[in-house]
Amino acid sequence: SLRCVKTAEEIARMREVQMYNEEATRAAVELIRGSEIDEHGGLIREDEPVTSERVRDVIAATLRPYACEERDTIISCGTDTAMPHCLGTGQLRAHQPIVMDVFPRNLKTWYFADMTRTISKGAPSEEIIQMYEAVHEAKEMAAAMLRPGITGAEVHNAVAAFFTAKGYETTGASGFIHSLGHGVGLEIHEGPSLSPSGGILEPGNVVTIEPGLYYPGTGGVRLEDMGVITNDGFD
């Protein structure tokens, strides 16, 4: 696809949207960080429950002055985080993973941005902590591999092998169960892909890296950054 290679102007537009995305995500994190824990383990702030819906409202309100909109923002908590596409609903809980996947679109330029963070109010289980550390290491490893000439498949498969070596599943309904990443532009999912069928990457490709681990009954962890393939790496 001709759209796979972005111009300098397109890249600048997408960096701008990602900057607003980062601001909105920070506002969401601050809402949760400033919350208290009620007697049932739920999060409250200013005597009101901190819900998935409330967090989405904060994100939307932060993006609105920049002519950006969010749709289907994922704010999931607890065992819901084991389902990558679960939007999340209701009161967030302490000591549980909270996955925030925010992908706004600028309504003036029509370009998207994309990022995901996993946080917790209060220490989560040791299992979730270990999953987080593995996902973070996988993301950093993938970023270091990205460069012109490598294939999306090579990077995806390297991350899968890394998770396997750590003792996590990579072939079934648990563990690492989705592609490592995807292109972003005028669509939130476009070419090129970091997947088992991903082709050769070239300068100007804008892609996400979003490794994740998911275990029903336990929860999930996903981290996602967006960047551009440069002449000698990934920025």
Question: Where on the chain are the PLM-derived regions?
Answer:
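Active-site neighborhoods and metal-handling regions in enzymes and metal-associated proteins
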Residues: 1-235
